[in-house]
From Swiss-Prot:
Involved in oxygen transport from the lung to the various peripheral tissues. Residues 2-142 form the Globin domain. The keyword Repeat does not apply. SUPFAM superfamilies: Globin-like. It holds the Pfam family Globin. Belongs to the globin family. InterPro entries: Globin (IPR000971), Globin-like_sf (IPR009050), Globin/Proto (IPR012292), Hemoglobin_a-typ (IPR002338), Hemoglobin_oxygen_transport (IPR050056), Hemoglobin_pi (IPR002339). O2 binds at H59. Heme b binds at H88. This is Hemoglobin subunit alpha-A. It comes from Otolemur crassicaudatus (Brown greater galago).
Length: 142
């Protein structure tokens, strides 16, 4: 998915609004994913997956940090996310569909917390951005 200059600008502005809440929103998106798509829990057998778990919060922060890195390097996401792509493809062997599920849950989380800012244009640009991130993360599977 190719992000237009407008999409990139919208994504950067939206992510600035997320700001210091990024880790919390990442954890909430993970919780939503685990509740809505229980099979995703199989990738985290060692985690306490209960609401507010320190492990889920910690992983939510990792997700948010990776997305922040992708936003900062939106013009070269393949390089910026290369190590993460290797990890998910070769060590963790995460089914690629799970990136789409988490992307959806993150969009829902952002819409809940930023309703005024989550316009149709922002939704569309963030959706394209998340699809691009998912594509990069699954690129090493081939």
């Amino acid at each position: 998915m190719v992000l237009s200059p407008t999409d990139k600008s919208i994504v950067k502005a939206a992510w600035e609004k997320v700001g210091a809440h990024a880790g919390d929103y990442g954890a909430e998106a993970l919780e939503r994913m685990f509740l809505s798509f229980p099979t995703t829990k199989t990738y985290f057998p060692q985690f306490d997956l209960s609401h507010g778990s320190a492990q889920v919060k910690g992983h939510g922060k990792k997700v948010a940090d990776a997305l922040t890195n992708a936003v900062l390097h939106v013009d070269d996401m393949p390089s910026a996310l290369s190590a993460l792509s290797d990890l998910h493809a070769h060590k963790l062997t995460v089914d690629p569909v799970n990136f789409k599920l988490l992307s959806h849950c993150l969009l829902v989380t952002l819409a809940c917390h930023l309703p005024a800012e989550f316009t149709p244009a922002v939704h569309a640009s963030l959706d394209k951005f998340m699809a691009s991130v998912s594509t990069v993360l699954t690129s090493k599977y081939r």
